[in-house]
Structures are given as structure tokens and as C-alpha cells.
Amino acid sequence: MRQALALTTLLAATVALALPASAGCKEEVLDALDKQRKAPAFRMETNMVSEQGPVKMTVEYMPPDRMRQIVTIAINPVPVESILVAGKAWGKDGDTWKELAPEIAGEMVTQLDEVLGDDRGTIGTVACLGSTAVEGQDLMAYRVENDAQVGPEDRSPDAKEKARAALADETRPLRMFYIDPKTGLPMRSVFARANKLDKPIFKATYTYPPDIKIEAPK
């Protein structure tokens, strides 16, 4: 269970470097994330590479305090499922649900808060890349740079040259963020090296099924 929680934490912490930013682009991404938080429920499905090999994770959110996550690791095909409802958490052992320790529930609450919290102070800078066709769907694409990861502002004489060199680094990590222009909702997020966008380290897709329900196990 803790391994699954660690993987979820890694997803929440995934950040990237980006192209020069635009205030308007940042507002578009922030508006999309705010709209997602206000949705009745949404589902995130991810594929990523971990030390244990390929990982598939499905996480469902029902703001303000409900979450379900199902994690499958390649070396152990039996999925690990857990539920959080109003600060209490349960894990599924075979066909039986068991209440999890308060400290594990607390970790899940923290993860939920990270996803549903305000991103305005942490998202960093954003660059618009325009309309992009993704698997047959036209989406608005963005690259995001997390200022907290970059560190304090570089005021050295060669700061501009350092910035140009960083953007020229084809192995630098990038986060690509995609928004549906019709609904204004986030649709996917990709974390990859700049020269390997077709082989992402982490990829998440977002859907908004109206039938998501998360209840405490009986």
C-alpha cells in the first residue's frame, strides 16, 4: 500500500521546464485546473515508469474529500485499491476491505489536497504551443516550467546565456499540458525528455464520467 502511495506522490510532484512564458497562457492553464477542481468528479488514468517497472494507475476524485486509486505494477499484476472518504481510508485485500492506519489516511489526504489545491503559487511559467492534434482530437497544448524547481532568480552576468543553454538542452525534462478548447477542461499531461516526447516517463489522461461514485466500504 505504501508503495502505491509513493507512486501517487511522485505523480503529484511531477514538474517540468518550458519555453519562455506568457501571462495569458498561464491564466488559461490555471482556469482549466480551477474548472477541473469544480467538476463533480473526474478520473485520471496514468502510465509511468518506476523502479519496479511499468505502472498503471487509475485515480478518481470527488471533491472535496473523496478519492479512489487503483495501482497495478508490472511485477505484481494484482491491483492495489484504496479509498479515501472524509479523512478515513480503506484498502482492499482480495475481496475484503480493511480500514487503513491513520498515518496512511493522512498521506492520502495530503495527496488529495495537492491535486485539489490552488496551483497559482506553484505552477510557475507557461508557454502556449497552440492547437495540436492528439489521437484524433484537437487540443490546446502548453509547456509548463515550475519556478520552485528552477530556484532563485539568477542575476549573474551570464544568466541569459545559461537560460539559452538550458532551453537548448534536448535532454531537459518537459511537462506538456493539453486542454479541450470546447470544454476548457484538462485532458492530458505528459512528462518526458525534450527529445523523447514520444516516449514519456509519465502520461496522464483525464475524463469526466458523470457516474463516478466513491463511498466508504460496507
List each language-model region with its residue ranges.
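An acidic-aromatic
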Residues: 56-116
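Beta-turn initiation residues at beta-strand->coil junctions
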Residues: 46-50, 71-75, 92-95, 146, ...
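Flexible, processing/modification-adjacent segments and terminal tails
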Residues: 24-29, 37, 91-155
